[in-house]
Amino acid sequence: EQPGGDKVNLGYFTN
């Protein structure tokens, strides 16, 4: 959901 996040949800967009 949030690109460049830090495992915001389940690590979908973990940068």
Swiss-Prot record:
Example GO biological process term?
Answer: chitin catabolic process
Q: Which residues form the signal peptide?
A: none
One example of the protein's molecular function in GO is:
endochitinase activity
Q: Which reaction does it catalyse?
A: Random endo-hydrolysis of N-acetyl-beta-D-glucosaminide (1->4)-beta-linkages in chitin and chitodextrins
**Keyword line:** Antimicrobial, Carbohydrate metabolism, Chitin degradation, Chitin-binding, Fungicide, Glycosidase, Hydrolase, Polysaccharide degradation
Q: Which cysteines are joined by disulfide bonds?
A: none
pH-linked activity: Optimum pH is 6-8. There is a 37.7% decrease in activity at pH 5 and a 39.8% decrease in activity at pH 9.
Task: Describe, from the UniProt record, how activity changes with temperature.
Answer: Optimum temperature is 35 degrees Celsius.
Question: Which family is annotated?
Answer: Belongs to the glycosyl hydrolase 18 family. Chitinase class II subfamily.
Q: How is its activity regulated?
A: Inhibited by divalent metal ions. Maximum inhibition observed with Ca(2+) while the least inhibition was observed with Fe(2+). Inhibited by high concentrations of GlcNAc.
Per its database record, what is this protein's job?
Antifungal activity. Inhibits the mycelial growth of A.niger, A.alternata and H.sativum.
Reading the lineage from the top rank, the first entry is Bacteria
Protein name, as recorded:
Chitinase
